[in-house]
Amino acid sequence: MAKTLARSTASRITKRLISTSGATTPSPSYILSRRSTPVFSHAVGFISSLNRFTTIRTRMDRSGGSYSPLKSGSNFSDRAPTEMAPLFPGCDYEHWLIVMDKPGGENATKQQMIDCYVQTLAKIIGSEEEAKKKIYNVSCERYFGFGCEIDEETSNKLEGLPGVLFILPDSYVDQENKDYGAELFVNGEIVQRPPERQRKIIELTTQRTNDKPKYHDKTRYVRRRENMR
């Protein structure tokens, strides 16, 4: 049943992306890198090469309104292992990677992209000042997106906002330093890492981009949601 449900969900996502972009499915081996690439190409490239995640968020039809993603509490340590098995170190469902398409529009500057990230998160939490506090990293080159610290229920509200492609549970790039990678973003400003840590982040990011995915099971997040009902 789970496999059938996963295949059905993946099919719906693929059809929606194709109808949105009108592009054919390529076979890229790199993370999002060019702003001119169609939406579907971005999506496939990101998923096929980013081995930090086992699944994209898939929205399930839930009748009856009884499902609550946070019914076991907001802290990872409070949740039963069967409900909240971590996929990777740092993957606590409190840190989310929001992947976007063409933030700020065509030919946007880096600052315009960052402003778009802040404005996008502000739409669901109330203010840009609060959004700046919640965003912990930004990416404007290897892929377009930002990391934010919000609970799972709040993360659900990002789906469907303009420019939002995927909502992914984030995980550490540098486990030793509990670092999620990309460019550090603190209170609305990019903060530079110490040179040694920055070199390590670059090495780890490059290595993970080139490695084949370690996990091929795309249904774990779906199964987790099913277990939490």
Curated annotation (Swiss-Prot):
Disruption phenotype: No visible phenotype under normal growth conditions.
Residue interval of the organelle targeting sequence: 1-57
Keywords, ordered alphabetically: Chloroplast, Mitochondrion, mRNA processing, Plastid, Transit peptide
InterPro entries (UniProt xref): MORF/ORRM1/DAG-like, MORF/ORRM1/DAG-like_MORF, S8pro/Inhibitor_I9_sf
CC per GO annotation: chloroplast; mitochondrion; nucleus
Gene3D superfamilies on file: Peptidase S8 propeptide/proteinase inhibitor I9
UniProt name for this protein: Multiple organellar RNA editing factor 5, chloroplastic/mitochondrial
Originating gene: MORF5
